UniProtKB/Swiss-Prot annotation:
Protein name: Cytochrome c oxidase subunit 2
Binding partners and assembly: Component of the cytochrome c oxidase (complex IV, CIV), a multisubunit enzyme composed of 14 subunits. The complex is composed of a catalytic core of 3 subunits MT-CO1, MT-CO2 and MT-CO3, encoded in the mitochondrial DNA, and 11 supernumerary subunits COX4I, COX5A, COX5B, COX6A, COX6B, COX6C, COX7A, COX7B, COX7C, COX8 and NDUFA4, which are encoded in the nuclear genome.
Species of origin: Salmo salar (Atlantic salmon)
Main subcellular location of this protein, as a coarse class: mitochondrion
Record GO biological process: ATP synthesis coupled electron transport
Function: Component of the cytochrome c oxidase, the last enzyme in the mitochondrial electron transport chain which drives oxidative phosphorylation. The respiratory chain contains 3 multisubunit complexes succinate dehydrogenase (complex II, CII), ubiquinol-cytochrome c oxidoreductase (cytochrome b-c1 complex, complex III, CIII) and cytochrome c oxidase (complex IV, CIV), that cooperate to transfer electrons derived from NADH and succinate to molecular oxygen, creating an electrochemical gradient over the inner membrane that drives transmembrane transport and the ATP synthase.
Gene name as annotated: mt-co2
Amino acid sequence: MAHPSQLGFQDAASPVMEELLHFHDHALMIVLLISTLVLYIIVAMVSTKLTNKYILDSQEIEIVWTVLPAVILILIALPSLRILYLMDEINDPHLTIKAMGHQWYWSYEYTDYEDLGFDSYMVPTQDLTPGQFRLLETDHRMVVPVESPIRVLVSAEDVLHSWAVPSLGVKMDASPGRLNQTAFIASRPGVFYGQCSEICGANHSFMPIVVEAVPLEHFEKWSTMMLEDA
């Protein structure tokens, strides 16, 4: 969950998000090392009084500044490609949910059940109860079981939207007439908030996403209750 004055990412709630956090630290460390080296060279060149006007070329230096950047790029690219493959890999999902973007709300359909679906609207500020978050709460949450592979099919009915939940490391564009898919595994119980991440009109900022991860037995009770109320 995000908090005021936060500088870093939200706490990871899925294996993919944990990998993204590790990659961020890895890339940031490389950037800091390069920046420190460049700053040191600039300061040394400006502050020194020594000059050498006879060195016009140096094959050794040219080899170093060609090979070293290539090695650095490889060190960044390899873990990045690994995470890209992990994000695209969807093996034997236990549950498939279709998320449809509308102006300006989300609708969810649990395709493994015959008649389990609902619309999810933002709770107005005047209807919030103590402990709820402004512009982030919905009247119906997308409930999923913990530690189960979940596939989310994302589309839109009218304009471009984007289904994103930072804690779970998922963000997928919702395009009219196109069915995109993403997947995640909630590694711990909790309530995870997201928002539409594509400008979609006047009420774009009023399209929150709430994913609630619960133990399997609680999910079964919830799905049974929803089917009975349908």
